[in-house]
């Protein structure tokens, strides 16, 4: 296990955004996206990094992007540090395995969420209203039940430290335009349906996931990350039992721990015991190995 990378600082490179997990540098005609070992829950960044998490996320995204190229192009130029501009080379050791050189796309002003199961905030919404994000669902569904068809539930892209808000498809059309909103919705559902089949063969249920899209040279492409344990709920298929929450290979383990604390889900984050940090890291690595046969 390498030293955790909580944040990066690369003199000579222009940092343009430090998000919950990723540090983005502007290289002129491309962006350098570095995935740190930071972890957030309830939109709050924890104090403790999860060792190698950034490498796991990068490798899982690479795996999925390559599976979806016939559905939609992605933003990767290269993940081989040797291909990066000369200014990046002094930082090759940190960048290896946790970075991507990516196209400069104009991001859509909405996040694209697809749900195949009743879980998380969707379950809370359904219990209260019989709907998820305004989409009416059959009566009598249990927590973690599979939906007859996946549903598309976009959200706003919140500023760091604030919460995303669910929006209707009509509201997405208002902020993104009809054509792009429809293209993003179609790509979201198609990617999810394909990924669900691939993961199913490897013993994993993908309950829901979130994608980001952008426009590059006039065309819609998928950006950011793809079907990672940060952006998705992964459940072990052999333990699936509707009627309650499921064990998972993702951030849900951390969320469940935090729910046991007397914490208001606002910064500052509570300290995480070493056991929770270690177990979270193990779950991420297990997801990567099960899906792609890769260890980091």
UniProtKB/Swiss-Prot annotation:
This protein's UniProt keywords:
ATP-binding, Ligase, Nucleotide-binding, Purine biosynthesis
Q: What biological-process GO terms show up in the record?
A: 'de novo' IMP biosynthetic process
EC number(s) stated in the UniProt entry for this protein: 6.3.2.6
Q: Which GO terms describe its cellular component?
A: cytoplasm
Q: Which GO terms describe its molecular function?
A: ATP binding; phosphoribosylaminoimidazolesuccinocarboxamide synthase activity
Under the heading Pfam families, the entry gives: SAICAR_synt
| Reactions accelerated catalytically | 5-amino-1-(5-phospho-D-ribosyl)imidazole-4-carboxylate + L-aspartate + ATP = (2S)-2-[5-amino-1-(5-phospho-beta-D-ribosyl)imidazole-4-carboxamido]succinate + ADP + phosphate + 2 H(+)
| Pathway annotation from the record | Purine metabolism; IMP biosynthesis via de novo pathway; 5-amino-1-(5-phospho-D-ribosyl)imidazole-4-carboxamide from 5-amino-1-(5-phospho-D-ribosyl)imidazole-4-carboxylate: step 1/2
The record's HAMAP family line, in alphabetical order, gives: SAICAR_synth
Return the similarity comment.
Belongs to the SAICAR synthetase family.
What is the protein name for this chain? Phosphoribosylaminoimidazole-succinocarboxamide synthase
Origin species, per record, is Trichlorobacter lovleyi (strain ATCC BAA-1151 / DSM 17278 / SZ) (Geobacter lovleyi)
User: Taxonomic lineage per UniProt?
Assistant: Bacteria, Pseudomonadati, Thermodesulfobacteriota, Desulfuromonadia, Geobacterales
The gene behind this protein is: purC
